[in-house]
Amino acid sequence: MDDIQKQILELARKANVPDPVHYVDYAVEELAKDKINEIIRTCDCCEECCHGTKSIVGGNPHGSILMIGEYVLEEQNGSEAVIPFEGTPEGQMIHSVLNSLHVNEEQLIWMNVVNCYTHKVVNGKSLKRAPKTSEQETCQLYIDYAINSFKPLYIVLLGNIAMNVFKKGVVKQERGKWFYIRDSIKAMPTYSPTYIRQMEEIGDEFAEDYRKEFQEDLSKVFKEAQEEYPESDILLA
């Protein structure tokens, strides 16, 4: 237990808080979310992109499931700070799926691998581009800190970039398959909502299959989580 946790525990005991040890965990999770977001907002590690829109941690820091996306989306550019998928067609899609599965979204934590709007300037115009490996590696420390602080029971990896932080491969081949992060946290990769949207927009013949498989993968995660941890109320029905 570090110094901050010891200080919180001492305050909790003085206040006669029921179950002070769990109170420490609760307080640390709240502080961790605020601290991560404070650092993200002021981060200037990547000169090319650090002065634009930032993706911060969203959802409930006490939640059971960490949902990791890829990067700030084009529709989100221009805001000071955004939560992953907030205000986008991808967000509408994923929340529709979660609603159909009766998921209690109070049990979810949201963050991205890359916390900036990655772009390049061409003829004075800002154009979206894929994150560089160096940008992904720089931002990974936030994910490591979040896992240490929030202690999620499960992690969902939305897309290739999210999966490759922990396991090298291609989502099409790895989706729907469990693997372990840090030997104890079950993780599952699935398609990025952005990829599904792109396939639908170009009329890809397998786009409908991708969406169905995406829903199947999420259903698998949440059903197992509910069975293993019924007290968490991960599913509402």
Show where each model-derived region lies.
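A polyanion-binding, active-site-adjacent surface
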Residues: 2-237
